[in-house]
């Protein structure tokens, strides 16, 4: 039995959905512990492409409990669309559970998110415009609406009074947007509550019962380490804590319950939205990575910025998450390159540094120092074990493991489930050196 946290080791979009889907085969419970519909993961099953934003990837396994935890923010309209999509694809969603204390993204959150981002002009953060930040802000101000509030009309009427009055004032007087109608919102969201009610549970009790019965629990993070509110490239971050420590807060468990932390990292680096990106590429190689890697956001559809693998942010992710092992994804995207570069240090103000500057202004000034490695220039898409990989691909993986000082447990070579080399199952396997 092992309880495992899966986190993104870069700026999100690392392929966590596929890795979580893979590990969910061995999990009894999968818990999404933070974020909202600003996240997106794509899973390919039997040539079907399923795009999810809120529901954990484990929903594809009939016997698995999939819990949207207390640390998430839920847009019930989008959640119900996901539920309907899964049902239409013949997927049983009886295992879906939603924490009664998850906060709800309301219509005024989305409107404010879009208006505030537009108002920033050239200083925009790159938000998805899905209302995530304003929802978390209301939560912190103790002014939020929770899933449990959608189950009782009197309760909803009471708790919406103050935030709606406040938000309508902002929308109308500052942004020139027509105020929202209270009764219309209440009617709409009570209907959402009624449709979701059979899935609503006490998050902490559900997880505690599973742990007491020695079940395998998988904690699924959204976004990535460098988007963490406290430890990322602030202010170009999300509004929650994707790092492994966020699993304890968002799921309501103690750190001693966590047995292992696996970080997911692409074989190169991407970022969507604004913010510093030391290894960002321009020109033909950037276009090649973007096209071969289908680097367009699941949530926004925006083209992702692409760059070489950054070992400095990788080592930072190892440290702040306490990573036990890595899953390296999209190795196949590098197949056609004759030379691959990896950032091994930065130059900041004329001095070489080997650490991640937590000040975004300093990070913007950092120039990457690269190590050049030979490419393999042949397809890896059909490799199913390490011995199938070209020698230079193996050398590349070994170099990443040595640079980040953490073993590699999984290598992904495409979107399909079977395009994966599992060196060791992070749930069932013992902790030992892999690819080092």
UniProtKB/Swiss-Prot annotation:
Q: What class of enzyme is it?
A: ligase
| Signal sequence range | none
Q: Which GO terms describe its molecular function?
A: adenylosuccinate synthase activity; GTP binding; magnesium ion binding
Binding of substrate: at which residues?
Answer: 298-304
Any one Gene Ontology cellular component term annotated for this protein = cytoplasm
Q: Which residues bind IMP?
A: 13-16, 38-41, 128, 142, 223, 238, 302
Source taxon at top rank: Bacteria
Catalytic activity reads: IMP + L-aspartate + GTP = N(6)-(1,2-dicarboxyethyl)-AMP + GDP + phosphate + 2 H(+)
Q: Which residues form the active site?
A: 13 (proton acceptor), 41 (proton donor)
For the ligand (GTP), the binding residues are 12-18, 40-42, 304, 330-332, 412-414
Q: What is its main location?
A: cytoplasm
Q: What does this protein do?
A: Plays an important role in the de novo pathway of purine nucleotide biosynthesis. Catalyzes the first committed step in the biosynthesis of AMP from IMP.
Protein name per the record:
Adenylosuccinate synthetase
List the top taxonomic levels of the source. Answer: Bacteria, Bacillati, Cyanobacteriota, Cyanophyceae, Synechococcales
């Amino acid at each position: 039995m092992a309880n495992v946290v899966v986190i993104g080791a870069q700026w999100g979009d690392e392929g966590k959905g596929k890795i979580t889907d893979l590990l969910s085969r061995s999990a009894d419970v999968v818990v999404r512990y933070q974020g909202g519909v600003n996240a997106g993961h794509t899973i390919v099953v039997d040539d079907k492409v399923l795009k999810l934003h809120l529901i954990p990837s484990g929903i594809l396994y009939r016997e698995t409990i999939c819990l949207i935890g207390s640390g998430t923010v839920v847009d019930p309209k989008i959640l119900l669309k996901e539920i309907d999509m899964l049902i239409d694809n013949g997927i049983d969603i009886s295992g879906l559970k939603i924490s009664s204390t998850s906060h709800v993204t309301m219509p005024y959150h989305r409107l404010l998110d879009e208006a505030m981002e537009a108002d920033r002009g050239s200083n925009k953060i790159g938000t998805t415009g899905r209302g995530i930040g304003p929802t978390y802000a209301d939560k912190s101000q103790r002014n939020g609406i929770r899933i449990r509030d959608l189950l009782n009309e009197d309760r909803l009427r009471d708790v919406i009074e103050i935030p709606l009055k406040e938000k309508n004032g902002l929308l109308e007087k500052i942004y020139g947007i027509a105020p929202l109608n209270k009764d219309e919102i209440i009617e709409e969201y009570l209907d959402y509550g009624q449709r979701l009610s059979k899935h609503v549970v006490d998050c902490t009790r559900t997880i505690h019962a599973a742990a007491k019965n020695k079940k395998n629990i998988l904690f699924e993070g959204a976004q990535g380490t460098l988007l963490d509110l406290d430890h990322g490239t602030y202010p170009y971050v999300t509004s929650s804590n994707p790092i492994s420590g966020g699993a304890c807060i968002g799921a309501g468990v103690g750190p001693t319950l966590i047995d292992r932390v696996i970080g997911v990292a692409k074989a190169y680096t991407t970022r969507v939205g604004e913010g510093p990106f030391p290894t960002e590429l321009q020109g033909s190689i950037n276009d090649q990575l973007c096209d071969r890697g289908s680097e367009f956001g699941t949530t926004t559809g925006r083209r992702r910025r692409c760059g070489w693998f950054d070992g400095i942010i990788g080592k930072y992710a190892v440290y702040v998450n306490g990573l036990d092992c890595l899953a390296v994804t999209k190795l196949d995207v590098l197949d056609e390159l004759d030379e691959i570069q990896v950032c091994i240090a930065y130059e900041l103000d004329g001095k070489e540094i080997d650490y991640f500057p937590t000040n975004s202004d300093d990070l913007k000034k950092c120039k990457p120092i690269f190590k050049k490695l030979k490419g393999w220039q042949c397809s890896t898409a059909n490799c199913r074990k390490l011995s199938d990989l070209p020698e230079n691909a193996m050398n590349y993986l070994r170099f990443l493991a040595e640079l980040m000082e953490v073993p590699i447990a999984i290598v992904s070579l495409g979107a399909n489930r079977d395009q994966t080399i599992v060196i060791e199952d992070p749930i069932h396997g013992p902790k030992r050196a892999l690819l080092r």
